């Protein structure tokens, strides 16, 4: 991922230095396992533990060797073994490259997922704050982009909060399914390494054992993870799109924060554009798109080919880095979000009370009219309001078939927006439960 969208913490996870450090963690864990089984002398293990390291200079040496070897793992093993000397012969004993690479990849993924989980928690806290702060902030609910029924901005935040909670649960599930390693040799048969080494090494690394590995940990695990990252990005795009719609000049119900000195357009000094929400929408496309090659990586030849490797070097870092970036960007948007309550009220008035059509329909059917007949009456009055300067209340009171069954007081009550929202506490209880207190 380009530097512009890379935050340091996540960028460090996917750095070359950290990758090779994780490879070294795996190699040392395997050496310790061999030592416990009496196959590596204790003094040799001690030297391996004390002498081996990875920093930027070591990474450069590995890259230089790779130019000759055309194999990054062999280059890594050669450089690390040189650090130790004679005892370096024990490094990589009985292993195949994927024993190291796939197991280390799980360690990298664990670090990356845990950062994303922290990001999600931050975002959820801000959404929750807005939900309670705007529990009674009246606005118009829209379906198909058209005014529907009264709503509150707080209820909109309840929807966002619950969706992010689902995404967090999905990520935790994907985390459980992807934190697997394997130390089982070239085709998973433990031909040059006993299962005890795998058990001891993976236990030290905090990973589970792939039950039926081949040369690799199977890529359906990683595909599930990438799909989950795409789902999280899709939710963020959904929320960002909502902000973009609500920031339209004609709507202007919410606005992204606009900081001192910020400029919106090179040509039009008046502009306040929802650029951060637009950026979220753009990067979400990249993250979501990466789930497709992840699923294609599931299809490998026989016990393994290398077609997935080049793909993962791109899609895993890019997806995590971009998602980390847009989660934090969305958090900043929420922190400074401007909610225009007065504009929400004025926009409600544009529909002239037509949002009450459903309640008038119910009232008429309760008076004994058939639903079809009542529907025709209400629609007739609604169309008159749309096509004239009159309010819905006025057209209802002018219609003798309405006033034959409904009093003005009943119509007034039906037009009260809070009549639509009397059960909002129930929604909050469902979403927040004990947190309501």
Swiss-Prot record:
Domain of life: Bacteria
Lyase found in the keyword field: yes
Group of enzyme by EC: lyase
SMART domains for the chain: ADSL_C
GO molecular function terms listed in the Swiss-Prot or TrEMBL record: (S)-2-(5-amino-1-(5-phospho-D-ribosyl)imidazole-4-carboxamido) succinate lyase (fumarate-forming) activity; N6-(1,2-dicarboxyethyl)AMP AMP-lyase (fumarate-forming) activity
GO BP: 'de novo' AMP biosynthetic process; 'de novo' IMP biosynthetic process
Keyword Lyase: yes
Residues that, per the record, bind N(6)-(1,2-dicarboxyethyl)-AMP: 4-5, 70-72, 96-97, 215, 266, 271-273, 310-314
Active site positions, chain numbering: 144, 265
Catalytic activity: N(6)-(1,2-dicarboxyethyl)-AMP = fumarate + AMP; (2S)-2-[5-amino-1-(5-phospho-beta-D-ribosyl)imidazole-4-carboxamido]succinate = 5-amino-1-(5-phospho-beta-D-ribosyl)imidazole-4-carboxamide + fumarate
One GO cellular component term: cytosol
PROSITE patterns reported for this sequence: FUMARATE_LYASES
E.C. number(s) listed in UniProt: 4.3.2.2
Keywords associated with the record: Lyase, Purine biosynthesis
Pfam family, one: Lyase_1
Pathway annotation: Purine metabolism; AMP biosynthesis via de novo pathway; AMP from IMP: step 2/2; Purine metabolism; IMP biosynthesis via de novo pathway; 5-amino-1-(5-phospho-D-ribosyl)imidazole-4-carboxamide from 5-amino-1-(5-phospho-D-ribosyl)imidazole-4-carboxylate: step 2/2
Membership in a protein family: Belongs to the lyase 1 family. Adenylosuccinate lyase subfamily.
Assembly and interaction partners: Homooligomer. Residues from neighboring subunits contribute catalytic and substrate-binding residues to each active site.
Its job: Catalyzes two reactions in de novo purine nucleotide biosynthesis. Catalyzes the breakdown of 5-aminoimidazole- (N-succinylocarboxamide) ribotide (SAICAR or 2-[5-amino-1-(5-phospho-beta-D-ribosyl)imidazole-4-carboxamido]succinate) to 5-aminoimidazole-4-carboxamide ribotide (AICAR or 5-amino-1-(5-phospho-beta-D-ribosyl)imidazole-4-carboxamide) and fumarate, and of adenylosuccinate (ADS or N(6)-(1,2-dicarboxyethyl)-AMP) to adenosine monophosphate (AMP) and fumarate.
Xref: NCBIfam families: purB
Protein name as annotated: Adenylosuccinate lyase
Organism of provenance: Aquifex aeolicus (strain VF5)
The encoding gene: purB
């Amino acid at each position: 991922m380009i530097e512009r969208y890379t935050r340091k913490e996540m960028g460090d996870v996917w750095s070359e230095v950290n990758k090779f450090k994780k490879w070294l963690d795996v190699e040392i864990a395997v050496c310790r396992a061999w030592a416990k089984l009496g196959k590596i002398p204790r003094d040799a293990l001690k030297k391996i533990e004390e002498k081996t390291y990875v920093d930027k200079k070591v990474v450069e040496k590995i890259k230089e060797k790779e130019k000759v070897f055309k194999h990054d793992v062999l280059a890594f093993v050669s450089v690390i073994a040189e650090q130790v000397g004679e005892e370096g012969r024990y490094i990589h004993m009985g292993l195949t490259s994927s024993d190291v690479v796939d197991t280390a990849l799980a360690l990298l993924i664990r670090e990356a997922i845990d950062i994303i989980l922290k990001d999600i928690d931050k975002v959820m806290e801000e959404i929750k704050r807005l939900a309670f702060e705007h529990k009674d902030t009246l606005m118009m609910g829209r379906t198909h982009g058209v005014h529907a029924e009264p709503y509150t901005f707080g209820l909109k935040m309840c929807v966002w909060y619950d969706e992010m909670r689902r995404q967090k649960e999905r990520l935790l599930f994907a985390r459980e399914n992807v934190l697997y390693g394997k130390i089982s040799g070239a085709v998973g048969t433990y031909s040059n390494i006993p299962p005890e080494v795998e058990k001891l090494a993976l236990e030290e690394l905090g990973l589970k054992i792939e039950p039926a590995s081949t040369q690799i940990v199977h890529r359906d695990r990683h595909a599930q993870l990438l799909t989950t990252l795409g789902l999280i990005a899709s939710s963020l795009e959904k929320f960002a799109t909502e902000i973009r719609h609500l920031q339209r000049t004609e709507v202007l119900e919410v606005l992204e924060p606009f900081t001192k000195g910020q400029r919106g357009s090179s040509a039009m000094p008046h502009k306040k554009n929802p650029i951060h929400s637009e950026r979220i929408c753009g990067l979400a496309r990249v993250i979501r798109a990466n789930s497709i090659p992840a699923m294609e990586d599931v299809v490998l030849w026989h016990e393994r080919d290398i077609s997935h490797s080049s793909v993962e070097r791109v899609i895993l870092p890019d997806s995590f880095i971009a998602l980390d970036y847009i989660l934090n960007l969305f958090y900043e948007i929420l922190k400074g979000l401007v909610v225009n309550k007065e504009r929400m009220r004025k926009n409600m008035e544009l529909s002239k009370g037509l949002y009450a059509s459903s309640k008038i329909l119910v009232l008429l059917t309760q008076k004994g009219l058939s639903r079809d007949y009542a529907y025709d009456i209400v629609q007739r009055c609604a169309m008159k309001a749309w096509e004239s300067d009159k309010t819905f209340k006025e057209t209802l009171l002018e219609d003798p078939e309405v006033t034959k069954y409904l009093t003005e007081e009943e119509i007034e009550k039906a037009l009260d927006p809070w009549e639509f929202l009397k059960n909002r506490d129930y929604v909050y209880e469902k979403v927040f439960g004990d947190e309501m207190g």
